Structures are given as structure tokens and as C-alpha cells.
Amino acid sequence: MKRAFIMVLDSFGIGATEDADRFGDVGSDTLGHIAEACAKGEADNGRKGPLNLPNLTRLGLVKAYEGSTGKIAAGMDGNADVIGAYAWAHELSSGKDTPSGHWEIAGVPVLFDWGYFSDHENSFPQELLDKLVKRANLPGYLGNCHSSGTVILDQFGEEHMKTGKPIFYTSADSVFQIACHEETFGLDKLYELCEIAREELTEGGYNIGRVIARPFIGDKAGNFQRTGNRHDLAVEPPAPTVLQKLVDEKQGHVVSVGKIADIYANCGITKKVKATGLDALFDATLKEMKEAGDKTIVFTNFVDFDSSWGHRRDIAGYAAGLELFDRRLPELMELVGEDDILILTADHGCDPSWTGTDHTREHIPVLIYGPKVKPGSLGHRETFADIGQTLATYFGTSPMDYGKNML
């Protein structure tokens, strides 16, 4: 029985790439800077001392980090016995966004440039805004700017509740985000508005990667909170991913846990499981792994590393999240059968010590574990697509156009 379990620690970069200067990210280092802060006692917020990730270390994380940066992460064990295969991978795609990283992991790098709304104020074309107001019968809109998701709620949340005007905003990513109150505006109405925005952006040729519904609750600035009902409307990958090939060519199964299905615009996904928060995502993943049959991929995105701690530049929160993940990792490893492979990786960096609130261009770890996987270094990989090609070889699908098999 062949099964693959892919766990994306969203934004868990392990050191700046050679082309980081193109992105203003030279010196960014998600793992390294978290470890450094922990070793100095600067991340003792409910957790304490050096970053403690013994299970990820056994799978090769510290060795992969050393390969990427030439050093051992502060306070971590560079001499631990390694029981998995490990690599550090460079991104071939032109961006450092979530769809690019995930599609490339599945064998389809994004070699075109996404469209962006680069103006920080009055970010969206008036023609687009007018169409949205007319088609969705809106009383107007708020925002129309670059912002972080929490700041914009404090800024416009109360006015939104009074007026019913949705909050439109963007970031350095290729996104059109819409924040609305779950109770006063309504979740279904928000999702419908996002569908309209997706259609208008596609028809208008804006080449925007994702429309994101950002529902929230609360009654005044300071206590607004985003809920777990986020929904991403992505464009479809430009070519069949290894997920699609497994389903089409081998009649296999691909189980999405968390936001994976949204990222791939449901292409190559046969089952969707929603969960919010690290523990809930972990529990859902374990359940799906126990039930998975032959020719199945269980694919989970642990979004909190990015959305709750990376973008919010919360070093202590990120460290605590990693330690929680690490404590639970043996539960996953116990479910890896004789012919299975477990792959732990990331889709980009989001250094919580870095300036601004955006992603960082970094190498990602590729940690592969299974009874038949030979432990040791797989070296520097030139593209995340090596993961996709490895899966294509493993499941016996037609080869991907990019990437090399690592096993």
C-alpha cells in the first residue's frame, strides 16, 4: 500500500535564498531568527529557553538548516542522530506567495508574474470597484488600501458594521481581500461577494492569484477577531499537478486538510476536511491518515505559522507553535506504514523578526521519513518541484515537467 503524507508548515523558511536581493529579503531567516531569540531568552512567553524541536531535529531539520545557511541554529543540536532524509530547496517560481509555493511543491512552478495592486492608498482600479458595487448591490466600500488583516479591522470594523460597506484591502501578495462581519453582513453574502470579485478579476485580466474572504466577529475596535471561516478563491494551476495526475491516471485519492483545496482551486482534490488551529489540524490529519487507503495523499497546510505568527511578527508565538507541532509529531510518525512516506516542508518564509508584515524569500526544509527511506542528506534542491517529481515517481504517474526525483 502506497500513501504519502505531506505536511506544509506554512512560512517555515530556513534561510534566505541566493536571489533574496530581488525581494529585499537578504538576511531573512525564519528558523534562525526564532532560534536566536529563544536562545537569548527573548521569546519566553508561556514557553522558555532555547527552541526545543527534538523530533524535527531527528528528521534532519537542523542539518537542512546548516546546509542552507552554513551554521547551526542557535541553541539547537547539530550532532543529533538523523533518522530521515533531508534537503533545503530553492524556489523556481517568480513570487514568494502561497499558491506559487504550493503549486511548485506539486510539480508546477509559477514562471509568469502575478498581477499586483501596488499602490498603498486607493489600491484598486475605480472601474473594478464600480463593477463590484453594482453587481453585488453594495452601499459602497471601505479600505481600498494595503493593510495587515488585524489593523484594518480596528480601523474600519465599526464603520463596516454601521454601514454594511465591505472592507477591501490588499498586501504585497497577489490578493484581493474582503473583510466582513459574520453576523451583521453574513457569511454567505461575503462568499457570494468573493465569487463576484473572482469573476471580475479574471474577466478583467488582472491576473490576481487569490480572492480571500476574511470573516470576523466582535463588536468594537480592539475586540474584533477573524474566524476560521476564511475562504480562498484561487485561479487554477497552469498545468496538471501531481495531485491531479494521481487522481486522473491512477484513480487515487487526495485528501485536503485545512486550506489546501482552496490553494489548488479544488483541482486534484477528492476530499476536503476543514479545521482551524494547530491542534485541530493535527487531529484531523491523524484521523485521515488512519483511514487512508492505497494510492492516497493526505495533504495538510498548518496555516497558523504564517497567519498568526509570521505576518504578525510574533516570534514567541511562532516558537511556541513549532514546539507544539514537534511534541505531536511522533503521533504522525507512528502512523507511517511500511511503504508510506511522510514529507514535512514549507511554501516560503515569513520571518517574524523581519521588517514589514510580508513573506520572505527563503529556502524551505524538505524532510522525508519512512521505513524504506534512506536517512541522510539529499543536498540543495534547485526547485520545490523535486517534491512533486518524487511523488510522481513514487506513485508511478507520468513524470512532471519540472523537478528531479529525490529518492
UniProtKB/Swiss-Prot annotation:
Its main location: cytoplasm. It holds the Pfam family Metalloenzyme. Pathway: Carbohydrate degradation; 2-deoxy-D-ribose 1-phosphate degradation; D-glyceraldehyde 3-phosphate and acetaldehyde from 2-deoxy-alpha-D-ribose 1-phosphate: step 1/2. Mn(2+) 2 binds at residues 306, 311, 359. Disulfide bonds: none annotated. GO terms for cellular component: cytosol. Its EC number is 5.4.2.7. Mn(2+) 1 binds at residues 10, 347-348. Binds 2 manganese ions. The keyword Magnesium does not apply. GO terms for molecular function: magnesium ion binding; manganese ion binding; phosphopentomutase activity. It comes from the Bacteria. SUPFAM superfamilies: Alkaline phosphatase-like, DeoB insert domain-like. Keywords: Cytoplasm, Isomerase, Manganese, Metal-binding. One of its GO terms (biological process) is 2-deoxyribose 1-phosphate catabolic process. It is found in: Cytoplasm. It catalyses: 2-deoxy-alpha-D-ribose 1-phosphate = 2-deoxy-D-ribose 5-phosphate; alpha-D-ribose 1-phosphate = D-ribose 5-phosphate. Its cofactor is Mn(2+). The keyword Cell inner membrane does not apply. Belongs to the phosphopentomutase family. Isomerase that catalyzes the conversion of deoxy-ribose 1-phosphate (dRib-1-P) and ribose 1-phosphate (Rib-1-P) to deoxy-ribose 5-phosphate (dRib-5-P) and ribose 5-phosphate (Rib-5-P), respectively. This is Phosphopentomutase. It comes from Salmonella paratyphi A (strain AKU_12601). The gene is deoB.
